[in-house]
UniProtKB/Swiss-Prot annotation:
Name of this protein: Exodeoxyribonuclease 7 small subunit
EC class name: hydrolase
Pfam families per UniProt: Exonuc_VII_S (PF02609)
Subcellular location: Cytoplasm
InterPro entries: Exonuc_VII_S, Exonuc_VII_ssu_sf
GO BP field: DNA catabolic process
The encoding gene: xseB
Catalytic activity: Exonucleolytic cleavage in either 5'- to 3'- or 3'- to 5'-direction to yield nucleoside 5'-phosphates
Main location: cytoplasm
Length: 83
């Protein structure tokens, strides 16, 4: 786990961030982590949660940009400006 905390959260994929977040939740629920370490990994968990939410918002925006015809069939996509 210690090596994971060195990785910048903003560089993680959704899958990697959610995997690490699940690991943190399990460790905290186990109750065997010392208090100071619990606080540290909780903070990391909060950052991971925000990253996952951000990536989900971006994915939702991309899906929302899919254009459809009158019958509801996808006809293409509109450009999306994600920064």
């Amino acid at each position: 786990m210690a090596e994971n905390t060195q990785v910048d959260v903003s560089r993680l994929t959704f899958e990697r961030a959610i995997e690490e977040l699940e690991t943190i939740v399990k460790r905290l629920e186990d109750g065997k982590v010392p208090l100071e370490e619990s606080v540290t990994i909780y903070e990391r968990g909060e950052a991971l949660k925000r990253r996952c939410e951000e990536l989900l918002r971006q994915a939702e925006a991309r899906v929302d940009k899919i254009t459809t015809d009158a019958s509801g069939q996808a006809t293409g996509t509109a450009p999306l400006d994600v920064q």
